[in-house]
């Protein structure tokens, strides 16, 4: 029973008879249950058209709506121009709990859509480990992938590997001079060498020519589709770094479907074709470099496409990658740091010049720790590995303090990191604070995980006592029960909104509110006590079971495990 759809359809039907056209209607949640469960302000919009007072319109519409006997609606009232709807909670709860019970962890899942999405995220340069800036990208991307798939899209994730350019040439030359520390995790060993070579070049600037020579030789080999000593050196360095990065991603519960190497577009000739096609537009200016004039798109800065000697730049290879990617999907989505805004706009403009569709881009602001900033060039950064290690260590300490089993510290630590990042809208800069991330009481993931564990504990106790759950709901429900039932019903809308707006924080914040609603229910509604009527016991147990299901599904969509005991 979809009560909201029933209400909206009934409103559309009566309003269309008044104004002979369909109108968009949005149901709002009321601030408290005394004012009903849902409200509409449509009468204020109709007042001008009908030349009537909104109060009178509301009263007239209520009379017509009452005559329709809307399924699931117990009462309808006109209040100062608003129309308030009161749910028949006994019917509503019974139907909803049965639906959740039947669908289990598929409750809220969208219908299969024949739409392919390629989602690119993380894509950190392979010159060191992921730091916490990359972590925000990775978590937003992975959570979004899970939500989009659950909503019914066919999703493929890409990691775009920047294996060309100066940074990788530095790593390759650094390995030649200093080697790699085999005792260290691979990406950290690469970072150490990267820092050493930067310091070395500051002291020996005359060696810079060797870096440029390496870059030229690598690109020449790629353009000729050759495999030689230079290409092997680059491939070794990149794969060595990626091995470490993949290990970190695995520890974060993140897996990419495809790793796309930037160099593949030089090797297959696509970069050359992109430059040729852009030349044909008449928008390319040749000075010291080849530059693309994008002033028609409101972008004053020119986009540098190639050096004077014709060698390609990151921008051209990025255009080639997008042309390829967008030809293989219906929707392309990129997750990028806010510092990439201008570059992303330039790539979009170039794609439009070439007659291509353009990607959707999710920009995120920077993340920092109170301790300070991050920099890979001189080796001052907080790696994701260190952050996760610290999270698990602190989670163990919290577990010991609370008498919780230590073996769930990984789930709590990883959940704390993933959730604390997912819950903040990407447009907002964030400071990662441990006291918030590992908060068992109010805002952290452990608070939500604890609500789930409490559900498991209640259900286990009921099983031991031989009490079965059943959606009876033949009694006057408390305000806490009503609030929790409404929250569970909202899950479907939350999935839709998160998927369609590409915003994972909507789901994250919903789960926190659901856990709070469950705790209020638990504190005020006895479940297994002897004095509780059998039908009430069964119904409340069913409510606990449904809450457990939705918390479990929601946390899984954020890539977070749910311990059964805490």
Swiss-Prot record:
Q: Which GO terms describe its cellular component?
A: cytoplasm
Name of protein: Arginine--tRNA ligase
Could you tell me the Gene Ontology terms of the biological process aspect for this record?
arginyl-tRNA aminoacylation
Task: Give compartment(s).
Answer: Cytoplasm
The EC code for this enzyme is 6.1.1.19
- Which species does the entry assign this protein to? Methanocaldococcus jannaschii (strain ATCC 43067 / DSM 2661 / JAL-1 / JCM 10045 / NBRC 100440) (Methanococcus jannaschii)
According to its UniProt record, which protein family does this protein belong to? Belongs to the class-I aminoacyl-tRNA synthetase family.
- Give the main location: cytoplasm
Lineage runs: Archaea, Methanobacteriati, Methanobacteriota, Methanomada group, Methanococci
The first-level EC class reads ligase
Q: Name one Pfam family in it.
A: tRNA-synt_1d
């Amino acid at each position: 029973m979809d009560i909201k759809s029933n209400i909206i359809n009934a409103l559309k039907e009566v309003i269309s008879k008044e104004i002979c056209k369909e109108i968009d209607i949005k149901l709002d949640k009321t601030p408290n249950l005394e004012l009903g469960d849902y409200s509409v302000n449509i009468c204020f919009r109709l007042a001008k058209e009908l030349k009537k007072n909104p109060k009178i319109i509301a009263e007239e519409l209520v009379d017509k709506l009452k005559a329709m006997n809307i399924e699931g609606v117990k009462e309808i009232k006109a209040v100062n121009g608003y129309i308030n709807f009161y749910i028949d909670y006994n019917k509503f709860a019974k139907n909803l709990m049965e639906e959740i019970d039947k669908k289990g962890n598929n409750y809220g899942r969208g219908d299969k859509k024949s739409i392919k999405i390629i989602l690119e995220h993380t894509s950190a340069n392979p010159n060191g480990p992921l730091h916490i800036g990359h972590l925000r990208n990775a978590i937003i991307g992975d959570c979004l992938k899970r939500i989009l798939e659950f909503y019914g899209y066919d999703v493929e994730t890409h990691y775009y590997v920047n294996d060309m350019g100066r940074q990788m040439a530095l790593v390759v030359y650094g390995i030649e001079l200093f080697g790699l520390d085999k005792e260290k995790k691979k990406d950290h060993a690469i970072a150490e060498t990267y820092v050493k070579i930067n310091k070395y070049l500051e002291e020996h600037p005359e060696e810079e020519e060797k870096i440029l020579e390496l870059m030229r030789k690598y690109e020449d080999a790629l353009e000729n589709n050759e495999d030689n000593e230079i290409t092997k050196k680059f491939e070794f360095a990149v794969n060595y770094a990626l091995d470490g990065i993949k290990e970190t991603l695995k520890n974060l519960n993140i897996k990419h479907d495809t790793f796309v190497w930037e160099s593949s577009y030089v090797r297959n000739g696509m970069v050359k074709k992109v430059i040729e096609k852009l030349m044909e537009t008449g928008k390319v200016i040749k000075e010291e470099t080849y530059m693309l004039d994008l002033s028609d798109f409101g972008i004053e800065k020119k986009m540098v496409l190639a050096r004077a000697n014709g060698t390609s730049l990151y921008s051209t290879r990025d255009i080639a990658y997008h042309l390829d990617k967008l030809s293989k999907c219906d929707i392309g989505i990129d997750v990028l740091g806010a510092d990439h805004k201008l570059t992303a706009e330039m790539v979009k403009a170039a794609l439009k010049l070439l007659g291509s569709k353009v990607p959707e881009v999710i920009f995120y602001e920077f993340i920092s720790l109170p301790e300070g900033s991050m920099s890979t060039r001189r080796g001052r950064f907080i790696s994701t590995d260190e952050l996760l290690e610290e999270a698990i260590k602190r989670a163990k300490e919290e577990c010991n303090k609370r008498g919780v089993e230590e073996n769930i510290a990984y789930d709590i630590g990883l959940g704390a990191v993933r959730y604390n990042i997912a819950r903040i809208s990407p447009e907002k800069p964030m400071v990662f604070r441990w006291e918030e991330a590992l908060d068992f009481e109010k805002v952290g993931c452990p608070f939500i995980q604890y609500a789930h564990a409490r559900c498991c504990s209640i259900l286990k106790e009921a099983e031991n006592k031989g009490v079965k759950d059943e959606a009876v709901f033949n009694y006057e429900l408390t305000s806490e029960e009503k609030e929790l039932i409404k929250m569970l019903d909202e899950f479907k809308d939350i999935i839709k909104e998160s998927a369609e707006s590409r915003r994972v924080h909507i789901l994250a914040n919903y789960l926190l509110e659901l856990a709070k609603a469950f705790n209020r229910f638990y504190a005020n509604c006895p479940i297994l006590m002897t004095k509780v009527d059998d039908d009430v016991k069964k119904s409340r147990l069913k409510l606990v079971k449904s809450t457990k299901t939705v918390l479990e599904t929601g946390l899984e969509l954020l890539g977070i495990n749910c311990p059964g005991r805490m």
